[in-house]
Amino acid sequence: MNSRTLKKHLKYIVPEMRLALIKEPGAKPVPIGCPDDLDKFVEPLKHYSEEHFVAFHLDAKNQVIGYHIVSHGTVSASLVHPREVFKAALLANSYAIIVAHNHPAGSLSPSPEDIETTETLIKAGKLLGVSVIDHLIVSSNGSCSLRETRPHLWPVS
């Protein structure tokens, strides 16, 4: 049975799924050299009254090629699942990601859940071949790079 025959057979059983990633015209990759380079991207997060979790997609040259809002939560939490974080990153053929979320109450200290999420994403990214470069926490008081403040979360390979 060839793939054409298989497709004909399967279309009577289940619908074929098609996923597409649509890039905005005119957007150009933006190089990232350090966490401060992301300030212009995360600035809007500082003003939200509910938690938002965002993933920035990078190419092999550490240039931001896209982003997606993974989740929008409550004033104190945002549900984040690795599947949702990496779905768009894989579709975008991302080499790496940087994730960021806001703390509406103003704290820049990572919660135990923030640490656990970071560890889970790093492990999932390693399995998928998409590196997690950093996890930023932002608030009206500034931003905090977990890569800089908690380097032990990133195992040396």
Annotate each PLM feature.
Residues 1-18, 59-61, 71, 75-157:
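Active-site-proximal loop/helix of nucleotide/amide-processing enzymes and allied scaffolds
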Residues 12-69:
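Long amphipathic N-terminal alpha/beta scaffold segment
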